[in-house]
Amino acid sequence: MSRLRLGLQRDWLTSVDSAMIPMSACTRRPTFDRLSAPWTNQAVGRRGSRAKTAEVAVRVLEEDIVIVGAGVVGLTSALTLQRLGRSVVVLDPSPPGSGASFGNAGTIADFAIAPVGSPALLKQLPSLLFDRQGPFSIRQGAMAALLPWLAQFAWQSLPAYSANNMRAIAALTLDAGARWQGLAADLEAGHLIQNKGCLYVFNNEARYQAGRRDMRLRQALGVNIELLNPGELAQLEPHLPQVEGGGAFFPDALSVSDPGHLVGLIAARAEADGVQIVPESVVRLSAQKRQVVLQLGNGQRVTARQVVIAAGAHSKFLADQVGDLVPLETERGYHLEYDGESDRVRRPVCAAESGFYMSPMAGRLRVAGTVELGGVKAPPTPDRLAFLSHRMRDIFPDLKAASRSWLGFRPSMPDSRPVISESRVGRQIIYAFGHGHIGLTLAPMTASLVAALVQSTAPEVPLTDYRVNRF
């Protein structure tokens, strides 16, 4: 069997910092943005144009398993499959873990079972969509393209559907902490995993009572929650301003002090175990009876027995090519970082009414979150970053300006459930995308389910709720 010999060996443990967008870049297109199909990356410099493809002599290489996407889901799947005796190649034009896997809030959130769409959100949706200063917004230029997705999102926000979606998500999340602790021990990365829980803060009594209703639903599905009054909240987080509402503490939740470094360790271990990580794009995908053919941005053609699509927000481009017209959209996620401010909070704290986390990380405080619908092509929205900055000044008036900012892309399904499924063409193509806000949380479980699909063994949970053709 031939092996791909395309890429330079990289230091996966340090390269992810290049994905940061400086504050001065907030009004221009980020250089790491994968701007259009073909699925490529400007910084890597490979663009799968027809002109370039025509200039390169096509070579056909044969592989066992190709995983498209070197985020945390793709890499944990690669590591799992390689250890099952399969031969795995990972393709991604960007450095491993440099997308949403890098820029998230760092929570391993067994409690994060509530879908984005809910009856409460549905009531507020018309006003939220046009509020550039709120926690849920939409880029106006993307409205027409988003209408079909928004219609499905609204439908999935109805009470019965929202409840079913919560149950489906809970089936994947409730042992997330134990899975990550096992993986971290294997990676000798236990020092990156913090066991201090996570906290929701409600700033007034009305929001606290609404939050209590949500927490009861989560408790019914097995989430361990402690409801706090303002005094108890102040004991846990003494540097936060006093609130009139209360809090919800999730004692079993874990957090990661440096998500980018953790994913880099997974990549390094995968390579040490024999996985080949190749910095290349996939521009075309076609399924045949016993194999899948991938055309790469450099003109090479690869055939594989099986392909796993784990390309996050960029997965739709490839799924569409084999007839799986999945309703995947992009939530544009932002973060700000404040160097030297990690002591402001002791654990990840979510300002519930604003939809963002304050997460203490190695040498810095990361403020991450909110939802902006609008695709991967547009530059960062200054209003989104200003929203985070202003809210942080409300909480900590003495806080200095942010050290840096970042924009990344979450893969979002209308029902907030991931797609973990065979393709319509069969087991030659497996999907593992659409994890929304909880890709980090669900990566080890998803890897186990991907392995079951690839190997035709019984999955740990039934996969009907996550099939690609459920819409």
Question: What role is predicted for each listed range?
Answer:
Residues 2-5, 10-18, 24-29, 34-39, ...:
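Low-acidity, Ser/Thr- and Arg-rich intrinsically disordered low-complexity segments
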Residues 61-63, 297-306:
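Core beta-strand elements of the Rossmann-like FAD/NAD(P) dinucleotide-binding domain
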Residues 64-89:
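N-terminal Rossmann-like FAD-binding beta1-loop-alpha1 element of flavoenzymes
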Residues 83-102:
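Glycine-rich FAD pyrophosphate-binding loop
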Residues 106-107, 112, 116-156, 284-287, ...:
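Active-site substrate-recognition segment that forms the wall
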Residues 147-265:
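Rossmann-like flavin
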Residues 230-232, 236, 278-292:
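A conserved short coil-to-beta-strand element within the FAD-binding core of flavoproteins
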Residues 353, 394, 398-471:
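C-terminal catalytic lobe of FAD-dependent flavoproteins
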